[in-house]
Amino acid sequence: MLTRGFTSIGKIASRGLSSTFYQDAFQLSDQLTEDERSLMLSAREYCQERLLPRVTEAYRTEKFDPSLIPEMGSMGLLGAPYQGYGCAGTSTVGYGLIAREVERVDSGYRSTMSVQTSLVIGPIYNYGSEDQKQKYIPDLASGKKIGCFGLTEPNHGSNPGGMETKATWDETTKTYKLNGSKTWISNSPVSDVMVVWARSARHNNKIKGFILERGMKGLTTPKIEGKLSLRASITGQIAMDDVPVPEENLLPNAEGLQGPFGCLNNARLGIAWGALGAAEECFHLARQYTLDRQQFGRPLAQNQLMQLKMADMLTEISLGLQGCLRVSRLKDEGKVQSEQISIIKRNSCGKALEVARKARDMLGGNGIVDEYHIMRHMVNLETVNTYEGTHDVHALILGRAITGLNGFC
């Protein structure tokens, strides 16, 4: 079994290598507050002790463990960047550090956590009424209830403006009747609470957010089977056939695509940090493997080609983390722009996937065995590079900001 890279300082010293420069090239830890460092270490301890031992079996069997949610809730990892209602109230950087540690173990686990935080608690916190916040957020933050976010549709992925799901007001029952379907929805088959976006005729066909609950008539959430990525998390659909939603479940402070896009921007920040956590793990695993592996009478790591790959990996990871830190600080200062988030989401996910592919190559045949973890990270990152805005969609967002011209056509 391959030793985890960041716990192998003793092995490094035994080889006469006193430097741990590769572990934190730009001294990120020194740029954190004491609370942020403490949070990072607590999250790392939980993830390594509780998540890592079960991830391989979860990936092999494509079986989601719902006990993860209350576990994460008890650690304060759910709803972390929000104040009150049972949430920890961390900085945006603190939330990013949590995502980094969870995804260091598995992108699927981080997806589960970040959906609950940014895409379920987030819209209720930012767009909900006080009654909605009091009713839903404490149970979501504790993990007593699981949530999901319904935006993507079978015919509308990168084009949410084409949304077909409809909300029709029924004056007789004083409810909205929701009809339509959402797909590729993380957590949906096990969710108790669903934040769903639909076009509302009562609001001039504008997009509005609704809180749905398990057990509502006409609501089903079938699981999507056969995934080759994010197998430790659960993904499904939301099917709605005249689902009656009471008026008090309408999110009052969200209108148009700015509602779901605001949620996605918060999620993308966590994804940017998380993807680099997976990249770091691949880098450390490949580094340790090539130090331990003897070929041609010397460590594989002594070959120039291996050192070039590791230099490239360390450079991209270190620069990426600095970008994540800066954009997160800007968000905490109320200065962040959505295009800045697009830069780090696009960069982190694209570079993390490149790092994982290089690391897989460095392990040769062993790179495809789940015992060594890298192949799992690699296929997970294929999805992470796709959701919450694909690599190319974020290029179009940035291109529009650069030129003032809309390339979405």
From Swiss-Prot:
Binding-site positions, FAD: F149, G150, L151, T152, S158, W184, I185, S186, T390, F408
Catalysed reaction equations from the record: glutaryl-CoA + oxidized [electron-transfer flavoprotein] + 2 H(+) = (2E)-butenoyl-CoA + reduced [electron-transfer flavoprotein] + CO2
PROSITE patterns reported for this sequence: ACYL_COA_DH_2 (PS00073)
Localization per Swiss-Prot or TrEMBL: Mitochondrion matrix
GO molecular function term, any single one: glutaryl-CoA dehydrogenase activity
Cofactor requirements of the protein: FAD
Pathway assigned in UniProt: Amino-acid metabolism; lysine degradation; Amino-acid metabolism; tryptophan metabolism
Residue numbers binding substrate: R110, S111, S158, F261, G262, C263, L264, N265, R268
SUPFAM superfamilies named among the record's database cross-references: Acyl-CoA dehydrogenase C-terminal domain-like (SSF47203), Acyl-CoA dehydrogenase NM domain-like (SSF56645)
Gene3D superfamilies given in the database record: Acyl-CoA dehydrogenase/oxidase, N-terminal domain, Butyryl-CoA Dehydrogenase, subunit A, domain 2, Butyryl-CoA Dehydrogenase, subunit A, domain 3
GO biological process, one term: fatty acid beta-oxidation using acyl-CoA dehydrogenase
GO CC entries: mitochondrial matrix
Annotated active site: E388
Assigned EC number: 1.3.8.6
Keywords per UniProt: FAD, Flavoprotein, Mitochondrion, Oxidoreductase, Transit peptide
Family to which this protein belongs: Belongs to the acyl-CoA dehydrogenase family.
Protein name (Swiss-Prot/TrEMBL): Probable glutaryl-CoA dehydrogenase, mitochondrial
Source organism per UniProt: Caenorhabditis elegans
